[in-house]
Amino acid sequence: MSLRLGVNIDHVATIRNARGASYPEPVRAAELALIAGADGITAHLREDRRHISDADIAVLTDLCHKRGKPLNFEMAVTDEMVGIALNARPHAACLVPERREEVTTEGGLDVIKGQKRIADATARLRTVGARVSLFIEPDPDQIRACVTAGAQVVELHTGAYCDAARAGETARAEAILKRLKAGAALAHELGLEVHAGHGIDYATVKPVAAIPQIAELNIGHFLIGEAIFVGLPEAIHRMRALMEAARVELEVLA
C-alpha cells in the first residue's frame, strides 16, 4: 500500500495572525507544498479562528480543486462547522475534539460518548461527497464506534507516541506504538481507511510510516517549523524520503 502525505498549513496562519497582517498567506504555502509533492492539504478551522480563517478555507478549496488534490477540512463537531463544510464541499472532513483553552488538539474524539452527534454530522457531510474521518485514540472500542457512526476513515492520534519517543521514554513509546499497530490492523479489518497524525517529525515518522495499514500521514507543525530553516519544499522532500524508506524496509522484511 502506498503512503500519502497531507501537509497541514495551519501554522502559516499562526505566523500571519501574530501580527494581524495579510501575510504569509496559507494558500501560498499550500501551493508550494503541492508542487513539492504533498498529496493533499489539511487545514483546521477552529471555532475561535485562532489561525485558519473562513476566507482561507475558501481559497484553499479553490486551489485544491484547480490542482486536482484533496483538501482535508479539520473541524469540530458543531452545527456551525458542519454548515461551513457543507458549503465548501471539501474532499475530506476530519472531525476532531476541540477545547478553546487547549494549545493544540490534545487527544482523540470520544466517539462512543458522542455517537449520535458524530453520526448525524457524518451523515450530513457525506451528502455532499465528503470523505469523513474521525480523529481518535487507537482504542478498539472507539474504532468500532467509528464504523457505527458511518465514518469511512479513522485518523489515529500519534501525539502520545511522538512525545514519549522524543522524551527518551523508550518502553512507553514502544507500548503506544504497539497500540497504534493493533488499532491500524483492526480498523483496516473493519473496512476503514487508516490515517495517522499529530506530533510527527523526522525522528518519529519511520516507525509510524512502517505500519502497513496506514494510507496517509498528516503532518503540519514540524514541517512549517523546519521550513523556516530549510524552506518548505526541502522539508517536505526529506519527510517523504523518510516515509518512503520506511515502506521500502517494510517490503524487505516481508
UniProtKB/Swiss-Prot annotation:
EC number(s) given by UniProt: 2.6.99.2
Active-site residues (renumbered): 44, 74, 198
Molecular function as annotated in GO: pyridoxine 5'-phosphate synthase activity
Binding site for 3-amino-2-oxopropyl phosphate: 8, 19, 199, 220-221
Site positions for Transition state stabilizer: 155
Disulfide bonds: none
Substrates-to-products reaction catalysed: 3-amino-2-oxopropyl phosphate + 1-deoxy-D-xylulose 5-phosphate = pyridoxine 5'-phosphate + phosphate + 2 H2O + H(+)
Functional pathway: Cofactor biosynthesis; pyridoxine 5'-phosphate biosynthesis; pyridoxine 5'-phosphate from D-erythrose 4-phosphate: step 5/5
Compartments where found: Cytoplasm
The protein's role, per its UniProt record: Catalyzes the complicated ring closure reaction between the two acyclic compounds 1-deoxy-D-xylulose-5-phosphate (DXP) and 3-amino-2-oxopropyl phosphate (1-amino-acetone-3-phosphate or AAP) to form pyridoxine 5'-phosphate (PNP) and inorganic phosphate.
PANTHER family, alphabetized: PYRIDOXINE 5'-PHOSPHATE SYNTHASE
Similarity annotation: Belongs to the PNP synthase family.
HAMAP family given in the database record: PdxJ
Assembly and oligomerization: Homooctamer; tetramer of dimers.
Full protein name: Pyridoxine 5'-phosphate synthase
Native species: Caulobacter vibrioides (strain NA1000 / CB15N) (Caulobacter crescentus)
